[in-house]
Amino acid sequence: MSTVRVDVGGAMRITVIGKGNVGGGLARRWQTAGHDVTALGREGGDAAGADVVLVALPSAVIAEGLARVSGLRGQVTIDATNIFGPYPAGFESLAQQVKSIIGGPTAKAFNTNFAALYDQVDAEVVRPGTLFASDPEARDITEQLIRDAGFDPIYLGDLGQARLLESLIGLTIGVAKGGLGPFFYRFNRPGELSAR
């Protein structure tokens, strides 16, 4: 259970675990939005002051990477990892593995977006989307941080849907390699695609 109360809509203290394209890119976007962001790399560090934790590690080193971080105490957590290889024993999704280690309300988000495009989000006429799944207690915070990164949140369901999101990596890469290249996406209701 989370020991942290976060003021949704206000500045949050965010610890990003992983300084690669995803973690580093989101850290920059959230800093620009006014959040207090600390980025931790392979050396680990302390997350005790964080309201929210983002996990952006390679799937094979999630447990090892999180073991190097002290102060993980049930914070709201966003898991942005993707599966490459087999799932860890005992877990149906990487998000469940992350939740078992950190212990707080968890969401799966940002794993279906191309980090290479983060710096182009603001140039878009319409906000691109981000699919996410979330524990109820993490939903409002996750939606706010998705918006603060420049995307529109698209809710898929509770954290039980995380594996479905993780399975999209093959489709996402396939579409990109098929000729489209890195892309934004958006889902709309009927009538919303008409010219504005």
PLM region descriptions:
Residues 2-45:
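NAD(P)+-binding Rossmann beta1-loop-alpha1 motif at the extreme N-terminus of oxidoreductases
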Residues 14-16, 55, 132:
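Hydrophobic Val/Ile/Leu positions in short beta-strands of Rossmann-like dinucleotide-binding domains
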Residues 44-76, 80-85:
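Rossmann-like NAD(P)-binding element
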Residues 81-122:
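Rossmann-fold NAD(P)-binding glycine/threonine-rich loop
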Residues 129-196:
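Active-site-lining helix/loop region of Rossmann-like oxidoreductase modules
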